[in-house]
């Protein structure tokens, strides 16, 4: 057997990892402005944590989950999404307690796992950034969270974005619409795809977001959920639209958008980005006021979203957005001869401890090859250290752009390298 990474996974090498780190840091800094704190949950959960919350009939549970029985015969699943584990943690750690300041605002960054056909921007191990806000039923919380996502994408420079918005209403509105949709679709059952015929029995709202051509034709004149919202649900959705307008965040109402998870109610949304003529979902989420009680916690409103890092990187690449990740090295130390080996190590370490980035040669190469390395690292300065420099205690440091040179003592470098850099760079 050839030892390679499993299908649907990837190795993220240093040059690429720098892009990931940049995106993660921008997300962290953005979320911090909104008073969100990071939460880290296990990569695997008890099967029921996901099946109970996401929905037994969803594609995630029926087709896509990586689940197994461990050596203690516990039914375990690798997490396929981030919200359910965070809600489980919220309840288990009693973050609903009165002494905990509300709303509780949490974000996570980590790996998720789904068994599906690998394609660009969608792998079997994928990485997700998500946020969850617990404790506020105020439509302003919906809008703030959507605005935070918009803020993040604006910071990254993403272009041609559209916010798609819909409401699933409260449970009674949703139940009334569910029945209306069943009544509408049942006469044309045989015209639906096999998956949607199953969905019609289990979760008819999912037929609305099917990508199959025959299903799209069938739902073209389907009743709109907005016609089945009760007064409470209408008021909530109208308030969300009004506040988005106040914040100058444009949106379109998309009544066929239902989201793939069963726990949503009231506001749901997706941000779409135009890429090579196609609309790609960049981020999606919504309100889930009943989910905490599914985990035997008290009735607690919630709102959140998730976005895939692979998908985000793909969109940035396709839109020609270059991330500012290339940071030049402060100094490269060229080493000549065995006599300078130990001193070079001490010198480069002293430079690093003063807060500068530094590298040295470890391969005993000729000076020309070492200078090429300095260029490839985009080093600002080069120090050459050989036997004579060790004996005299002095070296030449050169600005690698202007070629200006300075003679400095090794003592100056180890005690006050910042002053040298100020003079030379």
Swiss-Prot record:
**Location relative to the cell:** Cytoplasm
UniProt superkingdom: Bacteria
What is the main EC category here?
ligase
GO cellular-component terms in the record? cytoplasm
An individual GO BP term: histidyl-tRNA aminoacylation
The EC designation for this entry is: 6.1.1.21
Q: Which GO terms describe its molecular function?
A: ATP binding; catalytic activity, acting on a protein; histidine-tRNA ligase activity; transferase activity
Q: Which Pfam families match?
A: HGTP_anticodon, tRNA-synt_His
Give the catalytic activity.
Answer: tRNA(His) + L-histidine + ATP = L-histidyl-tRNA(His) + AMP + diphosphate + H(+)
Q: What is its main location?
A: cytoplasm
What keywords is this UniProt entry annotated with? Aminoacyl-tRNA synthetase, ATP-binding, Cytoplasm, Ligase, Nucleotide-binding, Protein biosynthesis
The family classification in the record reads: Belongs to the class-II aminoacyl-tRNA synthetase family.
Check the record and name the HAMAP family matching this protein.
His_tRNA_synth
Quaternary structure, per UniProt, is:
Homodimer.
Q: Which NCBIfam families match?
A: hisS (TIGR00442)
Name of protein: Histidine--tRNA ligase
Task: Report the gene name.
Answer: hisS
